């Protein structure tokens, strides 16, 4: 039940963000940043800034369980990759997502319901973010108000390294997977080398800047 509630509210928050972004002129970055801070504030109030232990076997199974000797998280990751790739590459909705990302005005003139597409993207993002949160809690056996801090930077770095254009309209699931692997190797490598966490943030920021600059050059400097 706790898993379903967590995923439900995550999807609901994503849907709310999508509703605000699609119905107003407020930049998506501002809306999601505000929602993130509201969520963290609610988490602090609810937990009283304390760490909550999660020891229920049915819950932790999704974080630490195995099927045929492989982590259940691996199966879920593969399922998300397949579903997301299918939506983007094999459906009309996927083509509309690329079109809206590339040029919202042109998409509107071509008859695409930009508001519905935007709403879906944010709701689906909320669903995936909440699913990741549930799996993280199941893996660490704890829930804290700071869980997920800086995860947004990991996500930005991964998608940019994977070839997603910051100007929109370009990107792929396979490229993002490669970006995630690269960021994972980079972070694990720095941990193994004993690099201070503060410097790890510096390195990650530099990587993002380089990736964005390369994207800027590839797009013709526009």
In which residue ranges do the predicted regions lie?
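Membrane-interface helix caps of multi-pass small-molecule transporters
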Residues: 12-23, 42-45, 86, 90, ...
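Cytosolic-side transmembrane-helix boundaries in multi-pass membrane proteins
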Residues: 82, 109-116, 188-222
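Hydrophobic core segments of alpha-helical transmembrane domains in multi-pass membrane transport
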Residues: 7-10, 36, 40, 76-87, ...
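Transmembrane alpha-helical segments in multi-pass inner-membrane proteins
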Residues: 14, 129, 139-204
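Transmembrane helix-bundle core of multi-pass membrane transporters
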Residues: 24, 28-91, 117-120, 139-148, ...
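Alpha-helical transmembrane segments within multi-pass membrane transporters and channels
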Residues: 1-36, 178-179
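Membrane-helix interface residues
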Residues: 24-26, 91, 112, 171, ...
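Helix-loop-helix "hairpin" substructures at the membrane interface of multi-pass membrane proteins
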Residues: 1-6, 12-17, 68-143
């Amino acid at each position: 039940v706790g898993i379903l509630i967590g995923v439900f509210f995550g999807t609901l928050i994503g849907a709310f963000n999508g509703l605000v972004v699609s119905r107003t002129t407020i930049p998506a970055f501002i809306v999601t940043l505000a929602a993130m801070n509201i969520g963290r504030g609610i988490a602090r109030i609810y937990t009283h800034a304390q760490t909550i232990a999660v020891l229920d076997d049915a819950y932790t199974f999704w974080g630490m369980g195995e099927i045929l000797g492989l982590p259940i998280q691996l199966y879920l990751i593969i399922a998300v990759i397949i579903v997301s790739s299918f939506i983007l590459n094999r459906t009309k909705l996927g083509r509309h997502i690329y079109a809206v990302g590339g040029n919202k005005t042109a998409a509107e003139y071509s008859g695409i319901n930009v508001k519905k597409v935007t709403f879906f993207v944010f709701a689906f993002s909320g669903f995936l973010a909440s699913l990741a949160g549930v799996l993280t809690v199941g893996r660490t056996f704890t829930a804290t108000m700071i869980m997920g801090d800086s995860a947004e930077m990991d996500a930005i770095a991964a998608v940019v390294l994977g070839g997603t254009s910051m100007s929109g309209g370009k990107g792929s699931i396979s490229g993002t997977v490669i970006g995630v692997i690269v960021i994972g190797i980079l972070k694990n490598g720095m941990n193994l080398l004993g690099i201070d966490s503060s410097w790890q943030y510096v390195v990650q920021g530099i990587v993002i800047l380089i990736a964005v600059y390369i994207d800027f050059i590839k797009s013709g400097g526009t």
